[in-house]
């Protein structure tokens, strides 16, 4: 059986240089693989597709659990952009096993990243 997970963000909006926090729940990790949370962005549209993991935290290898997390958003972003030719999207993903690839993604939550100072 494949492990199942869910992620709930405290807020779906974060500033460059700020942080995103939330709660992860998982169960069915009978193979005791590492559970992790990553913050990553990806581009879509014309041209090359790009993706990068900018922050990650491991939560352990329990069969089931619930854990709080906090991931730092880079000070220089990039910010979320939704244009006609290009989109830049952010996501928080639960990964079982915990690694920096897209393999093993068990749950995701979308995030909007805005320039520093916009939320004041």
Report residues per predicted region.
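C-terminal beta-sandwich interaction modules and adjacent acidic
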Residues: 1-120
């Amino acid at each position: 059986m494949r492990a199942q997970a869910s992620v709930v963000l405290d807020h779906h909006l974060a500033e460059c240089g700020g942080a995103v926090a939330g709660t992860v729940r998982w169960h069915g990790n009978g193979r005791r693989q590492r559970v992790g949370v990553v913050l990553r962005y990806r581009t879509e549209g014309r041209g090359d597709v790009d993706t990068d993991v900018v922050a990650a935290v491991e939560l352990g290898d329990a069969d089931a659990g619930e854990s709080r997390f906090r991931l730092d958003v880079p000070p220089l972003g990039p910010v979320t952009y939704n244009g006609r030719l290009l989109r830049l999207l952010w996501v928080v993903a639960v990964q079982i096993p915990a690694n920096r690839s897209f393999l093993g993604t068990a749950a995701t939550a979308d995030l909007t990243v805005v320039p520093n100072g916009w939320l004041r």
